[in-house]
Amino acid sequence: MNETLKEELLQSIREVKDYPKKGILFKDITTLLNYPKLFNKLIDALKKRYLALNIDFIVGIEARGFILGSALAYALGVGFVPVRKKGKLPAHTLSQSYSLEYGSDSIEIHSDAFRGVKGVRVVLIDDLLATGGTALASLELIKALQAECIEACFLIGLKELPGIQLLEERVKTFCLLEC
């Protein structure tokens, strides 16, 4: 990935102080989506990264992982599978809990997400990797469906939080921008 693209992406992402709570500097990728040529460059760069890896599906984490993941799946000509918050998928699901700062939450995937095929090759994608809780839970769901996660991909990885290190212990991890 070239440095010019990285700089353009950084410039296009809005930072919002004290959101969703005091002390957090939120990285808002919705502003990137206002620049179609830049968004196309991002998806083209990710397509180039994954094209030769024989990926069968892109798995996107709710909600901004849907934006990146569906565009990348389209570019690669592969299927897209959503990982959603508990209770949002209509058919039979598998569920995985994960810890939050205060309490826990759960995410789900349809039990037939990969058309019932075992051993499919997937890339997990989301906009941002912070603590790694949601991504690690997503990996468990992928594993439970007997799929192989080739790589976990994030537009942004927050270096000061443990997510990058925790995920790298389980799967190859790629963060386009490390902040």
Curated annotation (Swiss-Prot):
The alphabetical list of record keywords is: Cytoplasm, Glycosyltransferase, Purine salvage, Transferase
Question: Which reaction is this enzyme known to catalyze?
Answer: AMP + diphosphate = 5-phospho-alpha-D-ribose 1-diphosphate + adenine
A GO BP term here is: AMP salvage
Q: Which domain of life is it from?
A: Bacteria
| UniProt-listed Gene3D superfamilies | 3.40.50.2020
Principal EC category = transferase
Q: List the disulfide bonds.
A: none
Q: List localization entries.
A: Cytoplasm
Among Pfam families, the record links this protein to: Pribosyltran
Identify the pathway.
Purine metabolism; AMP biosynthesis via salvage pathway; AMP from adenine: step 1/1
Question: GO molecular-function annotation terms?
Answer: adenine binding; adenine phosphoribosyltransferase activity; AMP binding
Entry-linked PROSITE patterns: PUR_PYR_PR_TRANSFER
Q: What is its EC number?
A: 2.4.2.7
HAMAP family the UniProt entry points to: Aden_phosphoribosyltr
- Subunit architecture: Homodimer.
The family annotation for this protein states: Belongs to the purine/pyrimidine phosphoribosyltransferase family.
Report the protein's function: Catalyzes a salvage reaction resulting in the formation of AMP, that is energically less costly than de novo synthesis.
What protein am I looking at? Adenine phosphoribosyltransferase
Q: What organism is listed for this UniProt entry?
A: Helicobacter pylori (strain Shi470)
The organism that produces this protein has a lineage beginning with: Bacteria, Pseudomonadati, Campylobacterota, Epsilonproteobacteria, Campylobacterales
Q: Which gene encodes it?
A: apt
